[in-house]
Amino acid sequence: MTFPPLKSPLKFYAVVPTADWVGRMVKAGADTVQLRCKALHGDELKREIARCAAACQGSRTQLFINDHWREAIEAGAYGVHLGQEDMDTADLAAIAAAGLRLGLSTHSVAELDRALSVHPSYIASGAIFPTTTKQMPTAPQGLDKLREYVKQAGGTPVVAIGGIDLNNARAVLATGVSSLAAVRAVTEAANPEAVVKAFQALWDG
């Protein structure tokens, strides 16, 4: 089982709750966006994911769908992001056969080993700093552990997530990760589009 490699580096990775937010991120020029939608189900969820795919079509933005792999395949999304618990229930072979990229969350050395065993397109490591976005199973990882995870991942791209903002972004990038993911730094910003551009400038200058 092999998942496609990334077509281009993930760089700044915005995690947002709705298709409207996805559209805003595309217009702002975000390299990567993830729909993390917990509020919708059934046909409403399918329509929301289809709207996300339409918003990203023809743009530079790479669209990942959190958890909902069946709907992501149906909508023709760029990829799927799964948590550790989802690895037990998702049909990874179906995701690979559909040509979608796969990202996996990790919170420890053991989880990273498990994720790498299925050869994902990238792994996410976190939470790096304290975060209130979601309940985390482990304490914040910090930058020293993150450096070790980057080494352990080898050639697999690593996305750092959890409490990342423009104040600590450069220090996180210095660990060797290829991408920074942000939730609250975008969705709670007075000017989210300006935040996206400031993050992008860390790579694009």
Curated annotation (Swiss-Prot):
Positions that bind 4-amino-2-methyl-5-(diphosphooxymethyl)pyrimidine: 34-38, 66, 105, 134
Binding site for 2-[(2R,5Z)-2-carboxy-4-methylthiazol-5(2H)-ylidene]ethyl phosphate: 131-133, 163
EC number: 2.5.1.3
Record's GO cellular component terms: cytoplasm
Pathway membership: Cofactor biosynthesis; thiamine diphosphate biosynthesis; thiamine phosphate from 4-amino-2-methyl-5-diphosphomethylpyrimidine and 4-methyl-5-(2-phosphoethyl)-thiazole: step 1/1
Residues reported to bind Mg(2+): 67, 86
Broad class of enzyme this protein falls into: transferase
Keyword ATP-binding included in the entry's annotation: no
Biological-process GO terms, alphabetical: thiamine biosynthetic process; thiamine diphosphate biosynthetic process
InterPro entries: Aldolase_TIM, ThiamineP_synth_sf, ThiamineP_synth_TenI, TMP_synthase
CDD domains, per the entry: TMP_TenI (cd00564)
Cofactor entry: Mg(2+)
Alphabetical UniProt keywords: Magnesium, Metal-binding, Thiamine biosynthesis, Transferase
Catalyses which reaction(s): 2-[(2R,5Z)-2-carboxy-4-methylthiazol-5(2H)-ylidene]ethyl phosphate + 4-amino-2-methyl-5-(diphosphooxymethyl)pyrimidine + 2 H(+) = thiamine phosphate + CO2 + diphosphate; 2-(2-carboxy-4-methylthiazol-5-yl)ethyl phosphate + 4-amino-2-methyl-5-(diphosphooxymethyl)pyrimidine + 2 H(+) = thiamine phosphate + CO2 + diphosphate; 4-methyl-5-(2-phosphooxyethyl)-thiazole + 4-amino-2-methyl-5-(diphosphooxymethyl)pyrimidine + H(+) = thiamine phosphate + diphosphate
Cofactor: record remark: Binds 1 Mg(2+) ion per subunit.
Job description of the protein: Condenses 4-methyl-5-(beta-hydroxyethyl)thiazole monophosphate (THZ-P) and 2-methyl-4-amino-5-hydroxymethyl pyrimidine pyrophosphate (HMP-PP) to form thiamine monophosphate (TMP).
Similarity comment text for this entry: Belongs to the thiamine-phosphate synthase family.
Protein name: Thiamine-phosphate synthase
Organism: Neisseria meningitidis serogroup B (strain ATCC BAA-335 / MC58)
